[in-house]
Amino acid sequence: MKLGVVPENLPERLALWLGIPPPGIVESWLGIMASRVVMAATKLNIFESLAAGPLTAAEITTKCATHSRATEQLLNALVGMGCLYVKGEQYALPRKMRAWILADGKYSLRGQILLRYLEWHWWEHCEEYVRTGQPLRLHETLTNEDWDVYQRGMRAGIEFPANWVARKLPLPKTARAMLDIGGGHGFFSVALCRRHPQLHSTILELPQAIRHAAPLLEKERMGDRVRYVEGNALTADLGVSEYDLVFMAAVVHHFDEATNRQLMKRISRSLCPGGIVAIWEPLRQDRKGSIRQLGGLMNLFFGLFSEAGTWSAAEIAEWFRHAGLEPCKPRRMWFGPDLTLHVGRKPA
């Protein structure tokens, strides 16, 4: 997946072929506008107003309690982006958008789009981070309201990757106990437990995260098969030979290498013989010449707001070996920012 400039005629195609303008120039201009347009339309319920059918600009203005001329400008921007289309004097939501953009859509990303407002603010720290190397350490500074937006954003659209992980994870049929470190909204645990009826999961999470994630988990009606335990992954007692599976989704990019190595040792001790640890993470390319757009951006983003950044498959495999675990071949999702499932197995 890559963000780029799409030429609309022959002269534009020729200009791009000649490197006019060079990469990044147009993207930095159009990207900021396009992003804010979708964010505003989501926050102001423009998309929701069209859930029941096409409306005129005046009708949308009335439903959303917005300014008439400014609303029409926003609507036309959305048409230009392909997010809406015009039907006579009315604006309509394309069928392909409904499942993704509406609050009750099957793959709704509404919560994730609203999270962009927090991320917009976080990116203002980019220059300071590059100058000093000091990250934001967001998990230490998020307000109560921010935690709610953050958890809803993390939950939005996670069904596809969670179900993919549940299908691809080589979980032993005898597995009964799972530890989900930093599992937040809990849907990875939900997907795995639904696929493996004998499995029960404990989600180890910070108390401030649980406060806002628990209502999201309750909607899945998993009863006592998926439960929360308050604690910090870096200091909590993980036990000895207690779990058949220890799972972490988008966790290790928060920690530096020394911390991840130490955490992996503690996870190894907590695994039963034959048990597995699974890490689902965006992958950093091993060779600088092979860095792709989204991979490079994600590495900077995670470094900016947390402690470290993304890791390569070779680095994660080395953590496994250092902890006495046998690395399995990583499995990369066909869709997304090089999202990869890394598995290490404890000898039986």
Annotated model-derived regions:
Residues 106-280, 284-289, 337-340:
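Conserved adenosyl
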Residues 11-16, 20-54, 62-65, 69-176:
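Conserved Class I S-adenosyl-L-methionine-dependent methyltransferase catalytic core
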Residues 324-348:
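Core SAM-dependent methyltransferase catalytic element
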Residues 280-323:
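C-terminal alpha-helical "lid/dimerization" subdomain adjacent to the S-adenosyl-L-methionine
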Residues 1-15, 285:
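Compositionally biased, charge-rich terminal segments
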Residues 219-222, 294-298, 347:
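Short, hinge-like loop/turn segments at secondary-structure boundaries
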